[in-house]
Swiss-Prot record:
Cellular compartments annotated: Mitochondrion
Keywords: Coiled coil, Methyltransferase, Mitochondrion, Phosphoprotein, S-adenosyl-L-methionine, Transferase, Transit peptide, tRNA processing
Coiled coil (UniProt feature): 119-158
Family (UniProt): Belongs to the class IV-like SAM-binding methyltransferase superfamily. TRM10 family.
A GO biological process held by the record: methylation
Organism in which the protein naturally occurs: Drosophila melanogaster (Fruit fly)
Gene, per the UniProt record: rswl
Top EC class of this enzyme: transferase
GO cellular component, as recorded: mitochondrial ribonuclease P complex; mitochondrion; nucleoplasm; nucleus
Pfam families named in the record: tRNA_m1G_MT (PF01746)
E.C. no: 2.1.1.-
Signal peptide per UniProt: none
Keyword tRNA processing attributed: yes
Protein name: Mitochondrial ribonuclease P protein 1 homolog
Length: 446
């Protein structure tokens, strides 16, 4: 052991002795340069992540494409074999191009199996919907045949739905046109609101898909409202994952007659900068009242993994005013529940705030699972509901029990008791006959 330690000390001393002349030589060379009047150029730190990626040659691109095609064929063969074996994998006809693009990004086989199972569930739901649709079509044909037969047998006028009636049938296309017309009117007179779609690079595939679904729900919730916003989707890139998913949800959004505002430009180029207010949960200033002259901006981002204050940084970089919803002032959050809200919940909150100006009404769109229930809520309603559910299962009537309990509670709290023992008039207290039963005997004899 001592021999190894001595060898280690000797080796370290030799290394130090070899390194010392190098440092001295570097010092002497720098001193000579200073005497000569020439300075050494300072080394600049280069961040490799800030440099653009080197351009690939055509041969490299073709090789990568060939490797990708080979890997895609292998994955398709894997999915086909698993489907033939009866596993939870959809058929190859169900797969779309964006499905295979996502499969190529999955690193492990277990991740591919989970994704295949998810697609298999979607395929089964679609097949079930098609079967139900076919059954409904057969039922409709049967009803039409019965109606025609009834008309042939009865020559008199038949009144009712499907027959002679004062009411006109309102088709789904009519409701659709009416709601689109309401959005067109909102583009002319309603306040504006912006959804910032510039966070695609900060989301993974799943988050981008969730963001696209929430953007679709924002459009639907805004269109169904009586007083909708003039909604603008800014910083949109049609080749991004979020916009491609949104196009699958709304296939007609690029039609010229469709009432949606898509802008590839930033909102600072479209609206006055002094009217813009960025709604971000990371700032310290609460939004007290709704101002119809302001244009509120919501960042279209789903941050399940990334919790960085990106919207705050962007608002500061653009020099915009910032505000956050007064959630802590009006709500008591439960333990372990995050304060994040979806995009459609934000739109619903702002719609109700614009209509009523009341935060209590607007914040009803916050999920109840995230907040603590109010203590002043009467517990009797919960007990009545739970006990009533149990009684209905047992086929019992318990309304009289709750009515008696309610009468007793009101009597003891607000008025004189109705069903409580009261002191009788004309009776004197006698200690010798108290609690002996003699007083009752005297009353009976009298």
């Amino acid at each position: 052991m001592l021999k190894h330690f001595a060898r280690w000390r000797l080796g370290s001393q030799l290394l130090k002795g070899c390194a010392a002349p190098v440092r001295q030589a570097s010092k002497t060379s720098s001193a000579e340069n200073l005497i000569a009047g020439t300075e050494e150029p300072q080394k600049k730190f280069v961040n490799p992540f800030s440099q653009p990626a080197p351009a690939l040659s055509n041969d490299t691109i073709s090789e990568n494409k060939e490797e990708r095609d080979k890997r895609l064929k292998v994955l398709q063969l894997e999915a086909d074999i698993a489907h033939q074996e009866g596993r939870r994998v959809p058929s190859l006809e169900f797969f779309k191009d964006h499905h295979w693009e996502h499969v190529l990004t999955l690193p492990t086989k277990s991740a591919r199996i989970k994704y295949f199972g998810y697609l298999w569930q979607i395929e089964m739901k679609k097949e079930a919907d098609q079967r139900k649709k076919a059954e409904r079509a057969k039922e409709a044909e049967r009803r039409v045949a019965e109606m025609r037969k009834e008309r042939e047998e009865n020559t008199h006028i038949i009144y009712g739905l499907g027959h002679t009636s004062l009411f006109l049938r309102i088709y789904d296309t009519t409701i659709n046109h009416w709601q689109n017309n309401r959005l067109t009117r909102a583009m002319q007179f309603a306040p504006k609101m912006v959804l910032d779609c510039s966070y695609d690079e900060h989301m993974n595939n799943r988050e981008a898909t969730y963001a696209a679904k929430q953007l679709m729900m924002c459009f639907a919730e805004n269109r169904m409202n009586d007083e909708p916003f003039d909604l603008h989707y800014c910083n949109t890139q049609m080749d991004s994952r979020c916009m491609q998913s949104l196009q699958r949800y709304i296939p007609t959004m690029h039609n010229p007659e469709f009432p949606i505002n898509l802008h590839s430009k930033c909102f600072t180029e479209l609206f006055p900068k002094q009217n813009l207010v960025y709604l971000t949960p990371h700032c310290r200033e609460d939004l007290v009242t709704y101002n119809p002259d302001d244009i509120y901006i919501v960042g279209a981002m789903v941050d399940t993994m990334n919790n960085e204050p990106l919207s705050l940084a962007k608002a500061k970089r653009l020099g915009l005013r910032m505000a956050r919803l007064p959630l802590d002032r009006y709500l008591q959050w439960g333990s372990g529940s995050g304060k994040s809200l979806t995009l459609n919940q934000m739109i619903n909150i702002m719609l109700d705030l614009k209509k009523t100006g009341d935060w209590d009404t607007a914040l009803k769109h916050v999920p109840r699972r995230k907040v603590v229930q109010n203590e002043f809520q009467p517990r009797r309603e919960k007990d009545h509901w739970s006990t009533g559910t149990r009684a209905r299962k047992l086929n019992m009537r318990i309304d009289h029990l709750f009515d008696f309990d309610e009468n007793r509670r009101q009597a003891t709290s607000y008025a004189t008791p109705q069903n409580v023992r009261q002191r009788r008039e004309g009776l004197e207290f006698q200690l010798d006959t108290w609690a002996t039963g003699k007083q009752k005997k005297k009353q009976r004899q009298n």
